[in-house]
Amino acid sequence: MRLNTISPAEGSKPTGKRSGRGIGSGLGKTGGVGHKGQKSRSGGRVKPGFEGGQMPIQRRLPKFGFTSRKSFVTDQVTLAEIAKVDGDTASLETLKAAGLVKKEIQFVKVVKSGEVSRAVTVSGLKVTKGAKEAIEAAGGKVEE
């Protein structure tokens, strides 16, 4: 067997239908497009969102809000994820090393979801009130 002799199994790749090749093909004459009208012409398609001349919905509805650029570099981490960090200190660098946040993240907030069973020192991260209580109850501490 050689690379130039390999071919797909018989019948696994049916040949595509060729339109406009006679009435016996099933796609002759109009080629599956029908008679006249905009959609039978060359280049005859309407753009996405076109509503027949009626004002389209994306223009009828107002613009609103904006996306804060800080949201692209901010993430949140749960207590259950903090427990996965090696060592007893959780900081931005250790979270990145553990693969819990992406490398472009600059700000992290610890939220109370799940439980932390061992003493962990959280440094340089924002912490919610409930998460702070849970960390301190487990014997850990929070350093701003």
From Swiss-Prot:
InterPro entries: Ribosomal_uL15, Ribosomal_uL15/eL18, Ribosomal_uL15/eL18_sf, Ribosomal_uL15_bac-type. Keywords: Ribonucleoprotein, Ribosomal protein, RNA-binding, rRNA-binding. Residues 21-35 have a biased composition (Gly residues). It comes from the Bacteria. GO terms for molecular function: rRNA binding; structural constituent of ribosome. This is Large ribosomal subunit protein uL15. Binds to the 23S rRNA. Belongs to the universal ribosomal protein uL15 family. It comes from Alteromonas mediterranea (strain DSM 17117 / CIP 110805 / LMG 28347 / Deep ecotype). One of its GO terms (cellular component) is cytosolic large ribosomal subunit. Part of the 50S ribosomal subunit. The gene is rplO. Residues 1-59 are annotated as: Disordered. One of its GO terms (biological process) is translation.
